[in-house]
UniProtKB/Swiss-Prot annotation:
The lineage of its organism: Bacteria, Pseudomonadati, Pseudomonadota, Gammaproteobacteria, Alteromonadales. SUPFAM superfamilies: dsRNA-binding domain-like, Ribosomal protein S5 domain 2-like. GO terms for molecular function: rRNA binding; structural constituent of ribosome. The gene is rpsE. Pfam families: Ribosomal_S5, Ribosomal_S5_C. It comes from Alteromonas mediterranea (strain DSM 17117 / CIP 110805 / LMG 28347 / Deep ecotype). Transmembrane segments: none annotated. Belongs to the universal ribosomal protein uS5 family. This is Small ribosomal subunit protein uS5. NCBIfam families: rpsE_bact. The N-terminal domain interacts with the head of the 30S subunit; the C-terminal domain interacts with the body and contacts protein S4. The interaction surface between S4 and S5 is involved in control of translational fidelity. Keywords: Ribonucleoprotein, Ribosomal protein, RNA-binding, rRNA-binding. GO terms for biological process: translation. Part of the 30S ribosomal subunit. Contacts proteins S4 and S8.
Amino acid sequence: MAKQDVQNGEFLEKLIAVNRVSKVVKGGRIFSFTALTVVGDGNGRVGFGYGKAREVPAAIQKAMEKARRNMVDVDLNGHTLQHPIKGRHSGSKVYMQPASEGTGIIAGGAMRAVLEVAGVQNVLSKCYGSTNPINVVRATINALTEMNSPAKVAAKRGLSVEEILG
């Protein structure tokens, strides 16, 4: 699904989907294009953008700019997740769990693009329900932002990291 992988400055950019949409008016149809993109630094920062324009390149450019403005931080454990996580948005539900070194990214389509630009290299994941790319991207980013490192949990509870990990 990811059609473009460009190293622009310090960000990895991926184009997930381009769609032609139409508006029906008295004189006929007006066609425009939508683009869904994800941007990340490959080290725990990721964002997505959705752009719409009369031409494909303009839609992609708008989506990339929105993605750069809409970035969130993710607490990674090396190149995998801290713990198994679930996320949902609308009808899409995603489940991701950390994997051992050498596993790779076991994910489909839109979820794979988000994980790649976020810097996750080893993960097992599954998407349930709707596989609409926009909802899957939102669900994946929601899940990643809900993930907490042991240090964060320890700070919230007022305990040491060793006590949290057992």
